């Protein structure tokens, strides 16, 4: 008799996605981050759901409701800190996942890659709106500064900003709509994840060598289910260590002060995972130029498949490209550091150099390195 998982209409989908899926035999731990992102999304949805049961999206009570969750709700502090630090884990996994895609040439699966970029934008938007909800000083001023950037758009900018605010400043209407969007977006993200996986399963997974692995496949279960389970354990361990020992390590102390429109914090900065983009934004003196650079810092990922001129897919056997890739990683760390520093000498100059280097590596140096490596292949 045929196994039920192979004939049942619903179980058949699960079977083809998680059990009998043919997977390359040589994929490394860098391929764990997809499933870890799925775990992060589930953690965020469940903790967020329980937080939403006690949160009020009103400017007068939002801050107090978060305090109430931490003090009075049973294990509320735990749920709140898992949610806050879960976002950090989410972004660590996201950046690792994207980095893996760039290093091993996974961007040649263009549909999967483009849905991935869309997912990245959606997660960033969700995280930004979530940061506004506690209604602390950094929540309020972060919302004011970032939404204000849209005023740089010619002709419609000012109207657009007021339309998003729902008034003439960040106020109750803004908070309410941000809460509504923050609640609905993770479910849209979950739907996009399904599309992401649908496109991925059309082609099958890439592997570290970048060579087609059709002749060497193994079933997903038990090999990669146990491997993913180990990843889940390690991620959960790190998340719980962060939550239980130093839950405020990655947060901003200013956000423990209730929002006050009359008092600007000395250094307005976003959460650590946006600092690299914030540094690129600040390194351009022109407002519209800064906004374009900010958007392009992420959107540049969409150009990578078209800039791929190497005869090899993966960087595994391309030492010049490898050196450039790790320079890019170091550059992103530099930008993250600069984004958290005040706007003064020498940080301004370092930020500008790092921003130019970021775009130069992706748009100019990597294609050049590929050309050189192609020439070396002929020798």
Curated annotation (Swiss-Prot):
Record-level Gene Ontology MF annotations: metal ion binding; ubiquinol-cytochrome-c reductase activity
Cited Pfam families: Cytochrom_B_C, Cytochrome_B
Additional facts recorded: Heme 1 (or BL or b562) is low-potential and absorbs at about 562 nm, and heme 2 (or BH or b566) is high-potential and absorbs at about 566 nm.
Protein name according to UniProt: Cytochrome b
Topological relation to the membrane, as annotated: Multi-pass membrane protein
Cofactor(s) essential for the protein: heme b
Transmembrane segments: 33-53, 77-98, 113-133, 178-198, 226-246, 288-308, 320-340, 347-367
Matches recorded under SUPFAM superfamilies: a domain/subunit of cytochrome bc1 complex (Ubiquinol-cytochrome c reductase), Transmembrane di-heme cytochromes
Residues involved in a ubiquinone binding: 201
Protein location: Mitochondrion inner membrane
Iron found in the keyword field: yes
Free-text comment on the cofactor: Binds 2 heme b groups non-covalently.
Subunit relationships: The cytochrome bc1 complex contains 11 subunits: 3 respiratory subunits (MT-CYB, CYC1 and UQCRFS1), 2 core proteins (UQCRC1 and UQCRC2) and 6 low-molecular weight proteins (UQCRH/QCR6, UQCRB/QCR7, UQCRQ/QCR8, UQCR10/QCR9, UQCR11/QCR10 and a cleavage product of UQCRFS1). This cytochrome bc1 complex then forms a dimer.
Family stated for the protein in its record: Belongs to the cytochrome b family.
Residues that hold heme b b562 according to the record: 83, 182
Cellular component aspect of the GO annotation: mitochondrial inner membrane; respiratory chain complex III
Presence of the UniProt keyword Metal-binding in the record: yes
């Amino acid at each position: 008799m045929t196994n039920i998982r192979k004939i049942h209409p619903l179980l058949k989908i699960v079977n083809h996605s998680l059990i009998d899926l043919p997977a390359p035999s040589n994929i490394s731990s860098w391929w764990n981050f997809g499933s870890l992102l799925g775990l992060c999304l589930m953690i965020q949805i469940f903790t967020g759901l329980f937080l939403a049961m006690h949160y009020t999206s009103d400017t007068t009570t939002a801050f107090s409701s978060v305090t109430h969750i931490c003090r009075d709700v049973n294990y509320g502090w735990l749920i709140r800190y898992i949610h806050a630090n879960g976002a950090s884990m989410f972004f660590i996994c996201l950046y690792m996942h994207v980095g893996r895609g760039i290093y091993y040439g996974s961007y040649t699966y263009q549909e999967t890659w483009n849905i991935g970029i869309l997912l990245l934008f959606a997660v960033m938007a969700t995280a930004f709106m979530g940061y506004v909800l506690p209604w602390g000083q950094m929540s309020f001023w972060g919302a004011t500064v970032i939404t204000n950037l849209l005023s740089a758009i010619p002709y419609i900018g000012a109207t657009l900003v007021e339309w998003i605010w729902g008034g003439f400043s960040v106020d109750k209407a803004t908070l309410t709509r941000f809460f509504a969007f923050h609640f609905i977006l993770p479910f849209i993200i979950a739907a996009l994840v399904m599309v992401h996986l649908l496109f991925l399963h059309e082609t099958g997974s890439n592997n570290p060598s970048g060579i087609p692995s059709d002749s060497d496949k193994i079933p997903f279960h038990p090999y990669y289910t146990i491997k993913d389970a180990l990843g889940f354990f390690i991620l959960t361990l790190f998340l719980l260590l962060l939550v239980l020992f130093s839950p405020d390590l990655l947060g901003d102390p200013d956000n423990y002060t209730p929002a006050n429109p009359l008092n600007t914090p000395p250094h307005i900065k976003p959460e650590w995972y946006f600092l690299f983009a914030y540094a690129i934004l600040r390194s351009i003196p022109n407002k519209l130029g800064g906004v374009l650079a900010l958007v392009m810092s992420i959107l540049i990922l969409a150009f990578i498949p078209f800039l791929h001129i190497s005869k090899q897919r993966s960087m595994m056997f391309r030492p010049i490209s490898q050196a450039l890739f790790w320079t890019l990683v170091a550059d992103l760390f530099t930008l993250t550091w600069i984004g958290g520093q005040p706007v003064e000498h020498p940080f301004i100059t370092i930020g500008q150099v790092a921003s130019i280097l970021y775009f130069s590596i992706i748009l100019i140096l990597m294609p050049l390195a590929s050309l050189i490596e192609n020439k070396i292949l002929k020798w």
